[in-house]
């Protein structure tokens, strides 16, 4: 008796108690943390319990606390925690490089990345931007917008995505913003079109060389490319094979730098102009056109237009012209699809061709995302571009590698972790099985015992702060949880051989001895370990009666008799407790 009192007065008992178990006891009182088997007790001796200052009050407090936990034990699952607040993501910054004539913020109004993250639109021209790019810090853009000589916007930000709607280079206007494109690419910013393709489109002969590759791949019948000659400088420009020819100087847009040469004398004059410009030049045969053709592609949307000059100018984009939309043929689709594959892919592009009076087509140019929009569907095309940008932004990985989503409770994860065999609980006679945790742990019917301790989601499902099992708990003899009284009772009442048998059900388990029985009952079970002090049996007997509520619903006679016997043993435990 003195030995038990010394063991029960150990001050480390409260440290072994799980959080929340018997919360009404403010001083060291009754609870057990018995080892799973005699072999486990020899390897890991643990203090059994603390001294009992008031056994009667502690017993009834434990009874009331356990009765409150009984519905959770029978259900087999903890009540899921309340919904937590979702993570608020910062808005994504979209930099649109375009002139002030188009307000792109209205086309992105109400749109969200992945339906969750807001989009903040910053719009400016290349001339209003400056930046600093870093290897690990990304790209910091400084924007200073000036309207009518007055600075209206001046701020710095780190964009997440870029929509390029302006030419980055033009020799005719003296605008060279290729350094900004390099800086944006240096910062690793995604864009539509890609910054790699934007930089490659800063040289029209370079782009035309890609058309030559497509021409050799598809052939002149499927891809009719105009005949063109390239001169890196003025020195090789002696004569043209035939006249009239169209001479294009350097890199320019909107018809600038294009001259029609009728004869050899005019060609020599143009050669001197090329020498003064110190640039390259191209010549191509003049085509007496009936109308121009433009096939554009925005994402997966295709449109074809026909433009006819009314003023009689050989440049259809100069003077008066009539524009109309025509049917999209497979021939046109092949042209634009083939051109959209250059430079790693063009999300937005257009192909310009000329239809001659003899009925033949000639492809003369391809444009990227900076192409001007024409026709009656300009608003629709801008909306298509906005939808394309939002789709591209949604495909990008989120910062940190995780998508923003609210935290979810653990209960659905536990249900999904169960195997189909675990959902069907049925009595199998002749096969013993240790009982599952009664305090909200998932019921395991046909899975082996090591699998119960090896599931991480099942280890953390123990309520009231129960600690997860140790990594060495793969063997059934080492499965011991201080917060689960029923596991303590099952491990102390069954032999090691019985605890190591997997795949058993609850109904066929032999009833473990109650430590408050008489001497004759203990003699009948001499093969089992010696019972602890009778004061320790009140919680174990209590869990015996509560754990049977999970199996009593099946209504077998043996279980009813076992329940009645447990109640009788509980009464004897009360009598033994108060007699001391």
From Swiss-Prot:
Q: Name one GO molecular function term.
A: ATP binding
Q: Where is this region: C?
A: 91-399
Q: Name one GO cellular component term.
A: synaptic vesicle
Which Pfam families is this protein grouped with? Synapsin (PF02078), Synapsin_C (PF02750), Synapsin_N (PF10581)
Localized where? Cytoplasmic vesicle, Secretory vesicle, Synaptic vesicle membrane
Annotated region (J), positions in chain: 400-531
Question: Which superkingdom?
Answer: Eukaryota
E as annotated region, ranges: 532-580
Name the major location: membrane
Q: How is it modified after translation?
A: Phosphorylation at Ser-9 dissociates synapsins from synaptic vesicles.
Which segments carry the region annotation Disordered? 19-56, 395-567
Q: What tissue specificity is annotated for this entry?
A: Neuron specific. Detected predominantly in brain.
Q: Per its UniProt record, what SUPFAM superfamilies does this chain match? A: Glutathione synthetase ATP-binding domain-like (SSF56059), PreATP-grasp domain (SSF52440)
**Annotated stretches, region: B:** 28-90
| Domain description | The A region binds phospholipids with a preference for negatively charged species.
Spell out the note in the miscellaneous section: Regulated by calcium. Calcium inhibits ATP binding to the C-domain.
* Name of this chain's protein: Synapsin-3
Q: Which organism is it from?
A: Homo sapiens
What's the name of its gene? SYN3
């Amino acid at each position: 008796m003195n030995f038990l009192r010394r063991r029960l007065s150990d001050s480390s008992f409260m440290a072994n108690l799980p959080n929340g178990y018997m919360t009404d006891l403010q001083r060291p009182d009754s609870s057990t943390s018995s080892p799973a088997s005699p072999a486990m007790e020899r390897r890991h001796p643990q203090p059994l319990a603390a001294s009992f200052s008031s056994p009667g009050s502690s017993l009834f407090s434990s009874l009331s606390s356990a009765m409150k936990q009984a519905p959770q034990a029978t259900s087999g699952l903890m009540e899921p925690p309340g919904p937590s607040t979702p993570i608020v993501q910062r808005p994504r910054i979209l930099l649109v490089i375009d002139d002030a004539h188009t307000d792109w913020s209205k086309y992105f109004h109400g749109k969200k990345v992945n339906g969750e993250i807001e989009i903040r639109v910053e719009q400016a021209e290349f001339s209003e931007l400056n930046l600093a790019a870093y290897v690990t810090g990304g790209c910091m853009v400084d924007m200073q917008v000036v309207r009518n000589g007055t600075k209206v916007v001046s701020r710095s930000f780190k964009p997440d995505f870029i929509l390029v709607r302006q030419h980055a280079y033009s020799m005719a206007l003296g605008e060279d913003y290729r350094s900004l494109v390099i800086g944006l690419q240096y910062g690793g910013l995604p864009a539509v079109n890609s910054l790699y393709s934007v930089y490659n489109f800063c040289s029209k002969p370079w782009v035309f060389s890609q058309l030559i590759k497509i021409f050799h791949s598809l052939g002149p019948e499927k891809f009719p490319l105009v005949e063109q000659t390239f001169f890196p400088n003025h020195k090789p420009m002696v004569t043209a094979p035939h006249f009239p020819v169209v001479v294009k100087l350097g890199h320019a847009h909107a018809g600038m730098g294009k001259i029609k040469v009728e004869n050899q004398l005019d060609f020599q004059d143009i050669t001197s102009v090329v020498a003064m410009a110190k640039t390259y030049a191209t010549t191509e045969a003049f085509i007496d056109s009936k109308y121009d053709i433009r096939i554009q592609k925005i994402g997966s949307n295709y449109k074809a237009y026909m433009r006819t000059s009314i003023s009689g100018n050989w440049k259809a984009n100069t003077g008066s012209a009539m524009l109309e939309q025509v049917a999209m043929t497979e021939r046109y689709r092949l042209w634009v699809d083939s051109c959209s594959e250059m430079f790693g892919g063009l999300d937005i592009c257009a192909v310009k061709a000329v239809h001659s009076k003899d009925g033949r087509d000639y492809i003369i140019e391809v444009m990227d995302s900076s192409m001007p929009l024409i026709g009656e569907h300009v608003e629709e095309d801008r909306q298509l571009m906005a939808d394309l940008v939002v789709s591209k932004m949604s495909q990008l990985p989120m910062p940190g590698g995780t998508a923003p989503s609210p935290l979810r409770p653990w209960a659905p994860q536990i249900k999904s972790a169960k195997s189909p065999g675990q959902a069907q609980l049925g009595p199998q006679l002749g096969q013993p099985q240790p009982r599952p945790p009664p305090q909200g742990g998932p019921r395991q019917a046909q899975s082996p015992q090591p699998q119960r301790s090896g599931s991480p989601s099942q280890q953390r499902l123990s309520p009231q702060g129960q600690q997860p099992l140790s990594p060495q708990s793969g063997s059934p003899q080492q499965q011991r949880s201080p917060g689960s009284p029923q596991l303590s009772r099952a491990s102390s009442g069954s032999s090691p051989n019985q605890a190591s048998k997997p795949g058993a059900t609850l109904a066929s388990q032999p009833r473990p001895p109650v430590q408050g029985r008489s001497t004759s009952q203990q003699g009948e079970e001499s093969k089992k370990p010696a019972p602890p002090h009778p004061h320790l049996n009140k919680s174990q007997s209590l869990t015996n009666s509560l754990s049977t509520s999970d199996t009593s619903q099946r209504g077998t006679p043996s279980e009813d008799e076992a329940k009645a016997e447990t109640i009788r043993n509980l009464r004897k435990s009360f009598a033994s407790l108060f007699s001391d």
